């Protein structure tokens, strides 16, 4: 009986291990990126429905809508690139949001502005965003 022994050089084993590790890394990254996109799409759909129900529903009172403006602004800032808007609409929304934030940040005697009049500043922007998500 003769035993044939295959001798692999350490360099060839190292190359094989490196290739295997890189392949595994690419598979893991592909899975993570793919599932991340799916989660983000599901999240976008859920948030857009929530925004449309809140701000597109005439039975929701003005003060409830005003209280939820930060959620609308966060939605727009996160997903503005996904909304089908004309450049003019996008510019109008951005200007209204800037004006809203400037007014909200103004303080009188150390207290920020109160009342529902801030809601009126971005009323047009709200209607454009609601149309875009419906």
From Swiss-Prot:
- This protein's major location comes to secreted
Say yes or no: keyword Nucleotidyltransferase present: no
Q: List locations, semicolon-separated.
A: Secreted
Alphabetical UniProt keywords: Immunity, Innate immunity, Secreted, Signal
InterPro entries (UniProt xref): Turandot
Alphabetically, which GO biological process terms does the record hold?
cellular response to heat; cellular response to UV; innate immune response; response to bacterium; response to heat
From which residue to which does the signal peptide run?
1-38
What GO CC terms are in its UniProt record? extracellular space
Give the residue spans that cross the bilayer. none
Its function, per the record, reads: A humoral factor that may play a role in stress tolerance.
Q: Which family does it belong to?
A: Belongs to the Turandot family.
Protein known as:
Protein Turandot E
